[in-house]
């Protein structure tokens, strides 16, 4: 089988488009400085990781051995003994969050899910798909959950088994919910630790906080029950993917044996991408802890540079602690469209992921934002 000349030209044009725009992204969390050339040879195979990487599967073309090593890495990163954990490589942050919410619902079938207004939009879909009771909690101006409103809603609901959805870096403002404060308040309200579930959405910050000196609490050692992180954001991948880690004792409650594949089914999806575990495996094997720290430090320094430049020009730019998300007043549509910025209400943001090796692109954006600000202030 061969493509027509027109179809081949269409592909060639798209290739040129991708090359031109490879490093365009400054408004969304995506690291483009990856190189998985070593893995291109595996694209000729239909690698499918259906089932549990810890068990035999009758579908032999899987990358379970690599996925297991990926999960060992993230169990250690998120401070839970590997043998007490279970998780898998997902197709992105939404699946990881659904898995966490699913576990919470199975443990507490009548529980209510509490999440803040700044939570990722996918959680509203998850609520509908799982048919789980839910309450939207107010957010503080910086995007952090309003702890007073959280406890008020739990009290008003007389909820004995709350399911808490904590943000470890909100989508728009990069805010981190204080899970220590949440647990302290739940304890003060008389809710025992075994009577609630705590999921952490660390899509972006899950690969930032482990590599800073003054990280906010976010790990299993800090009290979470499950956590999701994206693979294509700080790590970088040509295919969207993610990682979810949970307590094995909770996952075992949902495990079902499937004779079709001679394995247990614990995952949200059946067929799973077998290539993304290879990419994540190569990424973690080819970067030392010190290299990750350097990448994160550079990204944080770049974010602070953007804040300082905008503030010097009189623009109210800011960022949360340990965040590479820089928030500022939303510029005109011409500017945010030209720079592909994410906007929400009256604010926009830029995100300094690791492929920004210099300030050229950031400076161009800031110059346009300053000019736009001055134009409309005149």
From Swiss-Prot:
It is an enzyme of class 4 (lyase). It comes from Morganella morganii. Pfam families: Pyridoxal_deC. It catalyses: L-histidine + H(+) = histamine + CO2. The modification N6-(pyridoxal phosphate)lysine is found at residue 233. The active site is at 323. Its EC number is 4.1.1.22. SUPFAM superfamilies: PLP-dependent transferases (SSF53383). Belongs to the group II decarboxylase family. GO terms for biological process: carboxylic acid metabolic process. The keyword Lyase applies. InterPro entries: Group_II_Decarboxylase, Hist_deCOase_bac, PyrdxlP-dep_de-COase, PyrdxlP-dep_Trfase, PyrdxlP-dep_Trfase_major, Pyridoxal-P_BS. Substrate binds at residue 120. The keyword RNA-binding does not apply. This is Histidine decarboxylase. One of its GO terms (molecular function) is histidine decarboxylase activity. Homotetramer. Its cofactor is pyridoxal 5'-phosphate. Keywords: Decarboxylase, Lyase, Pyridoxal phosphate. The gene is hdc.
């Amino acid at each position: 089988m061969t493509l027509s000349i027109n179809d081949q030209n269409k592909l060639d044009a798209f290739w040129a488009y991708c090359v031109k725009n490879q490093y365009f992204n400054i408004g969304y969390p995506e690291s483009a400085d990856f190189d998985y050339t070593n893995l291109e040879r595996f694209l000729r195979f239909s690698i499918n990781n259906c089932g549990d990487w810890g068990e035999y599967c009758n579908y032999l073309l899987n990358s379970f051995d690599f996925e297991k090593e990926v999960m060992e890495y993230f169990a250690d990163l998120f401070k839970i003994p590997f043998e007490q954990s279970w998780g898998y490589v997902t197709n992105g942050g939404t699946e990881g969050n659904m898995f966490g919410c699913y576990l919470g619902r199975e443990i507490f079938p009548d529980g209510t899910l509490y999440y803040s207004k700044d939570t990722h939009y996918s959680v509203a879909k998850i609520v509908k798909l799982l048919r789980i009771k839910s309450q939207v909690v107010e957010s503080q101006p910086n995007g952090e959950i309003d702890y007073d409103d959280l406890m008020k809603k739990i009290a008003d609901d007389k909820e004995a088994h709350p399911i808490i959805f904590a943000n470890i870096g909100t989508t728009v403002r990069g805010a981190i919910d204080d899970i220590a404060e949440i647990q302290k308040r739940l304890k003060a309200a008389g809710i025992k630790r075994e009577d609630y579930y705590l999921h952490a959405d660390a899509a972006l910050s899950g690969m930032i906080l482990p590599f800073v000196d003054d990280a906010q609490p976010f790990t299993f050692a800090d009290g979470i029950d499950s956590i999701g992180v994206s693979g294509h954001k700080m790590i970088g991948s040509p295919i969207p993917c993610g990682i979810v880690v949970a307590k094995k004792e909770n996952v075992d409650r949902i495990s079902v044996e499937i004779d079709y594949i001679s394995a247990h089914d614990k995952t949200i999806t059946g067929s799973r991408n077998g290539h993304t575990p290879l990419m994540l495996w190569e990424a973690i094997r080819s970067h030392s802890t010190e290299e990750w720290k350097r990448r994160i430090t550079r990204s944080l320094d770049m974010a602070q540079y953007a804040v300082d430049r905008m503030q010097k020009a009189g623009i109210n730019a800011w960022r949360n602690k340990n965040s590479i998300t820089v928030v500022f007043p939303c510029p005109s549509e011409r500017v945010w469209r030209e720079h592909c910025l994410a906007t929400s209400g009256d604010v926009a943001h830029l995100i300094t992921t690791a492929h920004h090796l210099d300030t050229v692109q950031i400076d161009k954006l800031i110059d346009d934002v300053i000019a736009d600000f001055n134009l409309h202030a005149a």
